[in-house]
Each structure stands twice: as C-alpha cells, then as structure tokens.
Amino acid sequence: MFKYLIFFLLTIVFGQDNLVVESSIVAKGLNKPLLVRFHPETNVMYVVQQTGEIVIINDKVPSENLFLDISDKIALSIMPGDERGLLGMVFDPNYVQNGYFYICYVDKDNHSVVSRMQVSENPLIVDKNSELILIRFEQPFNNHNGGHLEFGPKDGYLYIGFGDGGSRSDPFGNAQKLDNFFGTILRIDTNTDSGYTIPESNPFYNNKNKKGEIWSYGLRNPWRFSFDSMNGDIFIGDVGQDSWEEIDYIESGVGGTNFGWNIMEGNHCYLDSTCVSNQYINPIIEYPSDANYMKSLVGRKQTNVSGCSVTGGYVYRGSNINNLYGKYIFSDFCTGVLWALDYQKDIVYEITESVLSDDRHMISSFGEDIYKELYIVDFLGVIYKMKKGE
C-alpha cells in the first residue's frame, strides 16, 4: 500500500528520448475494428468490429464465415460521435474447456448489455441461442458507453468498464453516484451457472444503497483498461472532456478508488475551481487535449496538439522487444502517437515507428497475444503487430 500512495505523488515528464520499434500488418480489410483477442490455446486472432461482428483472421484477412454476427441486435453507430455497437469481448479463463466468452454491446433499445455466449459444436461458430444476459441497463445518450472486458489474472474475476452515460460534463453526475453502473469499473464472479455473483471482497458488497458490483468509480469514459500480467495492477485510459486526457492506475487488489470525474478532469478541478482535489485519486499521467481536434483533422499528426481521446494499452511483457519490456504502451485515437510509460522511473517516451508515422491512423485499441506480444488496432481497418526496431 505504501508504494501505491507514493506512486501518485510523482510527476510524469514527457519529452525523453524516443524508443524505436517496428510493426507489420497482420490483418486488413476490416470494418471499424475496435478490439483484437487471441484464442487462449492456438493464438488465432479474433477481431471485434463495432458493426456487430467478430471475425477470425486467416492469412491476414477475415475468414468468410463469421465467428459471431449480432448486427441485427445492436444499435448501429451512424452519426459522428455515436459510440454504440459491439464494444467488447473477452474469452473465459477456461474457454478451451467450456467454450464461454463474454461480450458487451449497446442494443437497439439503447441498453448496455453484458452477456455470456458459447461456441457451437463447430468451434469456429457461436451458438447464438446460448446467450445469457448478465447485466442490462439503459443508456441516456449514444456515447461514453465504455464496454471493455478483462479477466483479472490473479483473482479470475470479470472486470467491466462503463462510461458516465454521455453528453457533456456528465449532466446527471452519474460518475460520482454509487447506485448506478455509470463511470465505473465493475468486478464480478462468473464462475457460476446462474450468471454471476458479487465477490465479498468488493468494496460495496452487501450495501443496499450502493451497487455491490462496483470496484472503482469516478471515470468519464474508460476506453480500454488492462492488467499488468506480472502483478495484477490495472491501467486505465480515461478519455477527457475538453482539456486533459489521463491514465489512471489501480494497485492489484485495491478497490473503492474514486478518480474524481466530474469534479476533476485529470489533476484539475472541473466544475468548481475551488474543489477539494485531495479526496480523489489523481491520474499517473495526464496530457493536454483539444476537444475540437477531431472536427478538423482526424488522425493527422500536428506538433502542437497532443491529442483528443486517449487509448489505453498494455504493460509489455513479451520477449521480442527488449526496450519496451515492463513499460505501459498507450496512444491517442486522434493523433495516432504511440507512448511508453516506464512507471518505475516515471518517464514517458514517445515511440518512433516507421510504418505508422507517415499516414493517417485512428488507434482504437491494443491487443495482447498468448505470448504477451502487442498489437495495434487501427479503426480504419488494419491490425499491426509491434516488433523490435532495427
């Protein structure tokens, strides 16, 4: 716990020497890809598309037969700023034995849905009749839906991220309320036939006025979070409102953290300049953003703009890129810049990458295969694998 408290008192400084890596195209021809997952035994690549499909990649292109197609069930994103659709997927820790996996989507009635599904007798196709809905609640707007899913590497519980419900400035103050799921990371135990139970170690377990599923709260729109596979620490990319993007941190096993939104944006008071900021957990990284950037030049690099929408990534624990080992890799959806945080030395490096550096990219996510190697998901339809730089 002492390490946890010290960590948030340190200042992260950008502008260090760049780290050089390379990348190669491993999948293309995709339609609005948001996430990449890997079969826990074969390492075959599965890509989640916002349009409602999960596709399996063969020889760099989607296979002809879809693993899953729920495009008839989801609210399709049709307008700029509409973030609905199929948003998340994760394999059950025992997927090889039970065939279970979990998805998060926004349905046609504008409800966020978390459900469990199972593969059919053909392991390349899902049994659509197997869907068991675990969580379903109405979204007030069409953005800030969150939808990311991860299993904790140490406790085996399912963690689920949801945004504040959308619009501007969290108009209902959802993220500071504990009687709803908005602006939270949830933690549930899915090791039951009935759907899920709430772990007794959750901070609000058995509290009738608070949602027992909540693990952490005070988030605006957690766009991808992940666990350091070595120690179970959580890193969260939380998208800012107008001025600040942030990376938040939860030490393994520490629940009940309040990251401050909509009282705080990054390290700064948001609604009231005289807010009492020491009541909240500050981000380990913040960087300035321009909320209007995307309206003028999506995905084009500008030296005077840091970005407009953080994309959380992973702590690299692979064996092929020595200069990234132990560093947290993240990006920005609007600029496509790659960064690496050395959170032991409190230094952020910009990553120099020749394949991605000269073109338009909208980095919607990162992926980690069974060998702990990292992948970059470009919303424009391409998946890249990160490699050692020459």
Protein language model regions, located:
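Beta-propeller domain segments
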Residues: 75, 84-86, 164-350, 386-389
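Generic anion/oxyanion-binding catalytic loop in active/binding sites
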Residues: 4, 25, 78, 174, ...
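Acidic, Gly/Ser/Thr-rich repeat motifs that build Ca2+-stabilized beta-propeller blades
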Residues: 16-169, 224-227, 232-244, 306-344, ...
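A structural signal for well-ordered alpha-helical scaffolds and beta->alpha junctions
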Residues: 3, 111, 178-182
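Sec-dependent N-terminal signal peptides
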Residues: 2-15
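Beta-propeller fold detector
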Residues: 24-25, 63-72, 125-135, 197-204, ...
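Conserved blade-ending motifs and adjacent loop-strand segments that build the rim/top face
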Residues: 219, 347-370
